[in-house]
Amino acid sequence: SVRPFVIGNRSSLEQALTETGVTCAIRKIDALERVEPAAGVIDVLEPTAFDCGSINIGQVSAACGHEAVKYFEHAVELAQRGEIQGVVTCPINKEAVHAAGYHGDIGHQEILARMTGSALTATMLMTPGLKVAHLSTHKSLGEAVAYVKRPVLIEKLKLTADCLSRWSSKKPKIAVAALNPHGGEGGMLGREEIEEITPAVTDLQHMGYDVVGPYPADSVFYRAIAGEFDAVMALYHDQGHIAIKVHNFEDSITATM
């Protein structure tokens, strides 16, 4: 059975419950063995001593950014030791993390990559009826466009296909979204489809992967929702995030591959 608990600060969680009017008991634990799921009770493990009394709600805080990273790092360490079987994260304030001095760790994905020594990672957003992997996430739009390169596409699509294969017994079919309007219109609106994306798709097909595209971004997600594809590879943050959140915001999750 699932035995959930929170890694974080008990006082800040109690304050949040008060602010939101939620009635729930907070129980501090000092060891995982003490986790005892009960209705109306949240078990909290505090890995650090942190005084949140001076924190102003709604303002970016370097101290809070530091604590958020430390809590997540502790969760990852527990998972690496096999003491827990999964980690679920809440949104992290990237500005606070940056203010705390973690300039390379923009979000959870970067922290996971650092702690696991993974050179290749990617983000996948999932909601019932739609899965969207992302070639890039935490890059400016200009940087994201420059990142659309054949070798990167091949590696990220292979990673996506391999992860999907672990979740299902069937061979996944992945569609690649185009970067430019109308898929570039034969090069008139951009040449990334011709010079980078299509060659990457062709290479993967020769390797045996069921990868197709590029297809215009204004239709590929609709086709995936209709069941034509198992997943879509979006080429930058908002291209994929908007599709997922418009389709089903409330039931969407993010997974790091």
Segments from the language model and where they lie:
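Conserved beta-strand scaffold positions in the cores of enzyme catalytic domains, especially
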Residues: D43-V44, T121-T123, V132, S252-T254
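A broad detector of the eukaryotic-type serine/threonine protein kinase catalytic domain
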Residues: V97, G117, T137-S140, A146, ...
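Contiguous, glycine/small-aliphatic-enriched amphipathic segments in soluble metabolic enzymes
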Residues: S1-H108, P151-L235, Q239-I253
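A conserved active-site-flanking secondary-structure segment within enzyme catalytic domains
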Residues: E110-L112
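Short, flexible loop segments at boundaries between secondary-structure elements
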Residues: R114-L130, M257
